[in-house]
Structure formats: structure tokens, C-alpha cells
Amino acid sequence: MFFKNEEEAFKRKPEIIIELEKEVKIKPVEEKVVPETKEEIEIPKPSEFRESKYNSTLTKNLFTNVDKARTRDGFGEALVKLGEINDKIVALGSDLAHSVRAMWFAQKFPERFFQIGIAEANMTGIAAGLARVGKIPFMSTFGVFITGRNWDQVRMSIAYPNMNVKLCASHTGVFSVGEDGASHQSLEDIALMRILPNMTVIVPCDKLETYKATFAAAEVKGPVYLRFGRENVPVITTEETPFEVGKAEIFRDGDDVTIIACGPLVYDALIASQKLEEEGIDARVINNHTVKPIDRDTILKAARETGLIVTAEEHQIHGGMGSAVAEVLIQSYPVPIKMVGVKDKFGESGSPDELQRAYQLTSNDIIKAVNEVMKKE
């Protein structure tokens, strides 16, 4: 049995739990708006800013006072908009709808939102059933729960029958749930999802791209894994920045080396390219938002034109986006490659900044990888 809203679910819970949840977690949807902050990023000022090297559709304040916003907000806003224009859109939550922003949809379309409770496998089966009768279900929870805890159900109920279900994962990677530690940090989810036949895997880089990716996921005929986070991250794209499933975007042109990144590390890759420019290294930066199906043409073109590849992701280096890039290269055009990512470790508790440094996921670590791969040339 499932509930159409959290209020109905409360009636089934012990009184003490109801009171605790009201105090700790459940907030009115009107409080959803999180003001975007402007924080100056400390980066070296380049001796010459060669604007022509950068994608003209990126924000103009890329390196000074860049706007920040939560990628999960882009998902929540897009889901509401989709609900307005398509009555086949339905949403399912597993007791974390407020945290992942699915509650915004629930507030506007309560009859099309299903609160399943802490039962991800049940949510998956229900979503598959809704898809079977023509609905377009968006099921959402934390990344570690929707993938690892729930993998067999996703495999058999969604991927195997090729159900048109969208798996929307918030609080992914190292940064989003830093203080919660290893149990909540989904560092293996890209690998788990991209190995499944029929599954599309999308990892947008900022709030605006997450908004576009949510719309794009609705257009894909089949299962989609959409990965986003909790923390404020720089908004580097604009409304004019193209987004197409399976088509990577070149954010900076360059001839010496290519940095291929996804998710929040796309911004760090751009910062690294600025610092490398001061060292006389001309780095191409590619936003590889679609891990599957991967854009083989753009990757191989970069390999042929620059001869060196560095990948950067907030995920295990084994089985993640870097592995997907390496698979393309080894089959068609092998070149030296270096991967920046979590190196076969579980997560730890700490602030996002502390963990980014501890797991060597900063722009300086990308620069180090570039220098190492250039020595192999």
C-alpha cells in the first residue's frame, strides 16, 4: 500500500515519529526558494583572458563572482513545469521528497504524487507499473538508495523490460552529503547504472543544465538515470548553452590536452584550464554530461587533435565516466589518459571542501594529472 501525500502517511505512523518529522524534516513548500549566492572564487588572474577559447554561451562572469545554485533545485523546478504541460508526468518519493525537491511537484499536483515511504524497491515496482499503463514516472531519492540498495529491482523491473521510468538521484558523490559519511555517499552509482542495458545516464554540471536534463529525460523513450546534488555549485551555463542527450559540449577549445569532466567537476576543469594557460598549456575542456550513450565522436576528435586525455568526476575512477572514456579510446584511438576521481576508497565525514581536497578532486589535482599525462607523451 502507498500514500498519495505525506499527510496521509503521517496517519499511519506512531505519534512520536510524527512530531519528530514535523520538527526536523517537513517544511512548507513555500520555503523552497533558496536565494542564489554570489561568491568570489580565488583563482589566479590570467595575464591574458583569451575569450575566444571559451564557449560563447557560457556565463560571462565565469571566473569572477560566479553565481551559485543547487542542482536539485533545477530538477524540482523542471519537474513542476513538466507537470504543467504533460498530465502523464507523475512523481514518486521515498520519504525524502522535500530533500530532493520532488515535494514541489507534490504540492502542485497532489493527485499525481505518490509517497511510498522508506521502501525503494516498492517504489521501483510501482513506477514500472505506472509506466506500463502509459504514465511517465519520475521516482526520486538519494543516489545511494536508488542505485545500490535498489539495484536488482531496477534491473528486473525497469531496465530489463525497458520501462519508461526516470530515476532521479540527489545527494550524489562526495560533496552533497559530506558530513553523513560513507553510508550516504554514492560513489559507485554511475558504474551501477551504466552497466544496465537500455539505461541512459546523465550527470549535469549545474542547476540550469539539470533543468534542461530533466526535460530531456522526459523525452527519452526508456529508463534514465539523472544524477545531481545538494550543494550550491557554480552556474556556468546559460539558457543559450546547448543540451542534447548523448552530445558532449566543448566548453573551452585547446590543442595540447583535453580535460573531459562531468557534474560539479566541470567547473574545476575550467578553473584548471585557466591556471594551465598561465603555464603555457592550452587545454580543451569538454562537458561530458551524458555518460551513456557516450559521445564517441567528440571524444575521438579530441584524442586525435590533442593526443592526451584527462578525465575528472566525483565518483570512483573504476567504472565511472573516466572508464567509459577509456573504453572508447582503447577500442578506436589509444592515447595517454589520466583519471581524476575517487581512487578505490569509501567516503568519510567532512565538509565538501575538506573532502574535495582529501580525495584529490580540486582544480590543482586536475592540473597535476595534466602535467603527469604530458610527461607520458
How should these model regions be labeled?
Residues M1-R227, N232, ...:
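Thiamine diphosphate
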